[in-house]
A protein has these predicted regions:
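Short amphipathic alpha-helix segments
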Residues: 9-25
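Preference for short coil/turn "hinge" residues that link or interrupt alpha-helices
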Residues: 23-25, 29, 56-58
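Amphipathic, hydrophobic secondary-structure cores in small proteins
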Residues: 1, 10, 26-43
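C-terminal structural segments of small proteins and small subunits
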Residues: 39, 43-71
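Absolute protein N-terminus
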Residues: 1-2, 71
Length: 71
């Protein structure tokens, strides 16, 4: 199952992706799914089993994540 992290800015999405990949996590930039938001924007998709690591990196790097979702 994949999870999605959403962001208010493109900069935060790209910074999140780079930070996660730098420690070997499988993260990819994706459009925000319509069921989450009708607005345009970027999100990051990652395996749900990495949820704890992903949240830890976001907190450590002070990355502003709008929300986390399970798909």
């Amino acid at each position: 199952m994949d999870c999605i992290a959403t962001f208010d800015t493109t900069h935060m999405a790209l910074f999140f992706e780079k930070s996660c990949r730098s420690v070997g996590l499988k993260v990819k930039i994706v459009p925000v799914p319509r069921e989450i938001s009708s607005s345009c924007g970027l999100a990051c998709s990652y395996p749900c089993e990495d949820e704890e690591k992903v949240r830890s990196i976001a907190a450590e790097k002070v990355i502003e994540v709008s929300d986390y979702h399970r798909l």
